[in-house]
Amino acid sequence: IRSCDPLARFLQFYLNMIRGNVFLLNSTNTTEIFEQMIRIDEKDALIGISFPRYSMRTLKAMEFANDRQAKIITITDTIYSPMCLYSSCNLLARSNMVSIVDSLVAPLSLINALVVALCLKRPDDVKKNLESLGQAWDNYQVYLKDEFNYIDESLLSTPLQKEKEQKL
């Protein structure tokens, strides 16, 4: 939510690639968050990300998940953060507001480390998922391949080279 949205999207993208069944709570109002979380229970985990000025919507989502016995993980700046009220695991990273823009460098580094650690815990699953993704990307041409040659190489010849070739 708010300035933490890019961090949450990055984390959700990679967690979904590793495990699947990962959802991003994204909303402009609190009621929509509860609608998205209505099925959360003790088998689920919620990762709340918030830095000063702490988001009340994130805090309320964490409270709701906690009331339903879901596991709560927090990514925040200090143990004194209100985000730590409901979490059993606090991952701390500084987020200094040097100017009008929050610095997300440390939190993003923490998220990178978390993703790598989770990959190391389930290497076979990750390898299988990445191989399946790679196959899908190849089959449906998601990314350009080097073997495609969109440039007609004859057009790269200089006018002088063309003249020489015509004289021969």
Label the model's feature ranges:
Residues 122-160, 167:
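Internal, active-site/partner-interface "lid" segment
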